[in-house]
């Protein structure tokens, strides 16, 4: 999903897209923060592979992918 780093232009476009398509900016920001916190604890517990991508960056990419490609979600 993510390489050693994240392109800053791509990351900003994904973040802008999340905010633009959201009905509530605050809730979107909270979702990103909550997901980043989960990923940070997953990294801490060793559940995720070692990565140089920061949890907030990973959260933005994951939420953007879920928004753009809902057919990838289980269920």
UniProtKB/Swiss-Prot annotation:
Q: Which UniProt keywords apply?
A: DNA-directed RNA polymerase, Nucleotidyltransferase, Transcription, Transferase
Family, similarity comment = Belongs to the RNA polymerase subunit omega family.
Q: EC number(s) per UniProt?
A: 2.7.7.6
Give one GO biological process term: DNA-templated transcription
InterPro entries from the entry?
DNA-dir_RNA_pol_omega, Pol_omega/Rpo6/RPB6
Described by its record, this protein's role is as follows: Promotes RNA polymerase assembly. Latches the N- and C-terminal regions of the beta' subunit thereby facilitating its interaction with the beta and alpha subunits.
Q: What class of enzyme is it?
A: transferase
Task: Provide a Gene Ontology MF annotation, just one.
Answer: DNA binding
Species: Synechococcus sp. (strain CC9605)
**Catalysed reactions, semicolon-separated:** RNA(n) + a ribonucleoside 5'-triphosphate = RNA(n+1) + diphosphate
Task: Give the encoding gene's name.
Answer: rpoZ
GO terms for cellular component: DNA-directed RNA polymerase complex
- Signal peptide residues are none
Query: Subunit comment for this entry?
Result: In cyanobacteria the RNAP catalytic core is composed of 2 alpha, 1 beta, 1 beta', 1 gamma and 1 omega subunit. When a sigma factor is associated with the core the holoenzyme is formed, which can initiate transcription.
Q: What is this protein called?
A: DNA-directed RNA polymerase subunit omega
